[in-house]
């Protein structure tokens, strides 16, 4: 009889503890969303809040058009809110150029984008530039702003 009473007390105590401590209950096996950490989270937030990371130019152009300025304005707004983040603007040629011409066009595009971000109040130390010639022709007529 004592064993039965003891067993009953243990079972009741366990169920009461489960009711009082809901975090001990077994949860449904629902898939959990992966939590982005650190730089990956910043990159994802930048892309989502700034409307993407790529800014396009016209063929053989280094002048920022209205869509490019609008995209860079969104990026500048995000960067001003995150002064701890450093970005690199990578410029690209048009893909049909010679290597040297593609590097020069990419550098001018990257510098134009950087200058516009600085004009909008992004600190100079927060933005660097680089250029790709024929090494990365896939993103011709564009600059890409990369969170580092």
Segments and roles (model prediction):
Residues 9-18:
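Hydrophobic h-region of N-terminal signal peptides that target proteins for export
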Residues 2-7:
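Sec-dependent signal peptide recognition
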Residues 92-148:
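Periplasmic OmpA-like peptidoglycan-binding domain that tethers envelope proteins to the cell wall
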Residues 18, 67, 74, 109-112, ...:
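Residues within well-formed alpha-helices
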Residues 20-86:
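Periplasmic peptidoglycan-binding/tethering modules of Gram-negative envelope proteins
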């Amino acid at each position: 009889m004592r064993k039965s009473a003891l067993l009953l007390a243990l079972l009741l105590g366990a169920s009461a503890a489960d009711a009082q401590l809901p975090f001990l209950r077994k949860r449904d096996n629902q898939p959990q969303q992966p939590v982005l950490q650190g730089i990956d989270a910043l990159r994802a937030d930048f892309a989502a809040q700034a409307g993407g990371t790529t800014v396009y130019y016209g063929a053989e152009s280094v002048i920022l058009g209205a869509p490019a300025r609008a995209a860079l304005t969104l990026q500048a707004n995000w960067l001003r809110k995150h002064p701890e983040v450093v970005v690199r603007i990578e410029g690209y040629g048009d893909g049909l150029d010679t290597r040297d011409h593609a590097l020069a066009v990419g550098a001018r595009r990257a510098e134009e984008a950087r200058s516009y971000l600085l004009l909008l109040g992004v600190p100079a130390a927060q933005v660097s530039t680089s250029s790709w010639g024929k090494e990365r022709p896939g993103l011709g007529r564009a600059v890409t702003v990369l969170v580092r």
